[in-house]
Each structure stands twice: as C-alpha cells, then as structure tokens.
C-alpha cells in the first residue's frame, strides 16, 4: 500500500450488509479506488479483561453483523454489547465508522464509546492497535473509513436476560415527551430509552387552545428493563417480530397510543404531565426482537403507500401491487420484502438522484435546549406524514467528527442531562423536493447547535461542510495517521452531488419511491 498511487476503499458487501451507504457520493468515489475485500472478516470470540470494570469484552472482526454479534454473546455468556445498532445487518466496522446509536445510548453513548480497542489498517499499510482515548481511536468514528480501515474491535458487554419489559408513557405534545426523556436520563436507572412522536394523520388528538399546534403530537416514551431467565420465562409476553403477517413495531406502538387516547378521551381525564401519569401499557419482548425492533420495516420506511382512490386509475397495475404489498394483511405473503437487508438491496438499485428527490432520511443530533424549536420547524416545513424517532445520546468531547461531539469550551447546557437528542426523520415526499428539504434540514440543524449523521443524502457545499467538521483538525489527523494519500476524504465519501438526468430508468424508479 505504501508504494501505490491508487487510493483504498472497502469492496461493497454482496449480502446487503455492505459498505455502500445511501449518500449521494457513495456510488462514485469507489470507482477511482482499489477495493479491499473484507468479506471473510467475520470471526468472534469472548475474552475476559479484568481492566474493564463490570463488563467482558467480545473480540469481533469488521464484517460481523449485529445479529451475529448478539446471538454469539447471548449464547456464550448471556451478555450483550452495551450498544447494539438497530438493524440486524449493520456490521461492526460500519457501526464504528458511521457512529451508530440505539436506546442504550443515553447510558453508554454511541457504539464507539463502548469500544475498548481497534485494529486498524492505516494508510502506510501497517496494522496497528489503537486503544480508547488514543488519537487514532478518537478519529475513527464518524469519518467513514477516511482515517483508516477497521479490521477488528473489542466491544464492552454487560450481563443480559432473554427478555425486556417495556413500559410505555403517553403524552399529547412533543414538549412533554422530550421533558420525560430528559427526566429519565437524569434518573440514571433505566437500561433502554427512546421515544416516538406521531403526526396527526396517524395519532389524531383533540384541539387544545393553549398549545402550539405544530408541537401537539401524540408522543410515546418507551423505557425498557431486562427481566426473566431462560429457566423462568415471563408468563405474559408482547410484541414479536413476525416477518410474515406481523406488525411493524411502530404500528404496534401507534395502535397502543391511539387506544390509550381513545380511552382517556372517553374518561375525559387525559393528562400530559409525566409526574402525574404512570405507564399506560407494559409488555415483555424477547431480547433479540427488542434490539432489532426497527429492523422489520426499516423503522417505517416500508409503511403502506397512501394514494387517493379517485386517482387509482392513473397507476399501472404493477405499481398498485407495489403500493398494497406493505399492508399488514398482504405481508403474510410479501413480508420478507420488508427486512432492512432486502429493502436496502432494492434501494441501492435506484438512481441516487431519484432517492434525493423522493426521500428525506436524516438523523439530526440536537441539543435539548433547542430540540423543541427544531421539531416545530420540521413539522411546519417538511411534508412527511411519518413518525419521528427520539433517542437521547450522551455527548462526547473527544471524537470531533461524531454527531454527538460537544467541544469542552462550549457553554454548558441549561438542562441537567448531558445528552443530545437524535431526531430520526425518515419519510417520502410527493413533490420531488427531497433534496431541497434536506438542505433546509442541514442549515437548521447547524443553526440550532446540532449535527447530523452523514450516512444518508448530504448537500453541503465544501466550505460549509468543513466549517462544521473542522477541516484544520481533520487534515492534521489525516496527515499524522498517513491517511491523506491513501483514502478518499470524508467530504468525497459523503457529499457527492447526484445529477438528475431524466433517464427512463429514473422516471420509472421515481414512481416506486
């Protein structure tokens, strides 16, 4: 490697778990690179380490998926990694490079924060081991392989049970839901924590004069605790991931919330203050089903496509079939289409310009002080009718390219919880202005002191991008780790511009998205 001129990138996987992201530049930068095949890097083993307090380490190679990781650690030691990314086929290398998170992130931070050490292929051709807190370790998360290529990592694990008891708390405004999330973070008692806020099309609420209509959204906060054992399983169990004929998890939560509000309206005693309301529903979910609850349906991106009956005849029959394929009763036959592994395979066949026009898929990390204003703006400005995922994440001050990064000299938050709120905004737009809405999101996110993840469509100018991600620090670190000439830059990897060519392929694919 040290003597060759061609830059290096990872060969995309053939199983749907590969390294091609949905970012606009993902399909182009690898064309000028020599590609390294890591498909055989799938070994896992447990290793006790007395230096890691209250945890054990699992040593796994870069291409191990989250599903393989969880099944191995549960089977070997009844443990799970401290943070498990939400999709079954996300790889360990991808979770590190892409700054993955999930519902334990309020407690442990992002996936990278639970990594004890990493073996990295550097630009000089050496394989080095970097430990937590080292310069290279701090540079890897959020840089998408532009600092070095992850080969192997040691992840911290914690004891686990086979079941999770999930408690659901209902709120009739997003402000109350956010407050509840922050209150739970401050309590530092719960293992799993996230929330969903629903649009009025899915969770209709009665009007209240003294509330901001934009923020009046049915919102649910979910708290999870580990319970039970294989020898003594709970008698009452709840939602299960059933690929054929089962409900998407968000549908299950939405139905619970609607039923709760219906009963509350009937009793005329709906309350919004978390200090006076108890969980309206509890259920027990298998650990694996809970960890990957958003995998089936890709959160809600596989939701049934809505169309007006009077326009039905304007659709071709095969497109009508596509529209109805994701309805629950049809999933008895079509269910296997809606795992993320299959959905991303299909999505990657679509021209990136079509994806940019038709979809808004973004994760924006927003400080607690400004998150309510951010969500109000999203509701007013982006025409999607899907839920928004709310997931608190501990901020860090040593990984400068992650969305959860907070400089040490930044002003202290006015709330007690040391977290950012990840707002997962995933939806389709019918007017073909997805790229415009994404640009507006990028600007608003920065304006309110946040950062977004870079795995999806990005439309930053180069100057705006390097203002946010500090090119001076980035270039110094790239040079010190011999990455400058060896790997494409972070901007090249994530911010290519997709052009709309009006080809017949794009015209047809635009009907599907």
Model features per residue range: what roles?
Residues 1-513:
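Noncatalytic alpha-helical scaffold of FAD-dependent oxidoreductases
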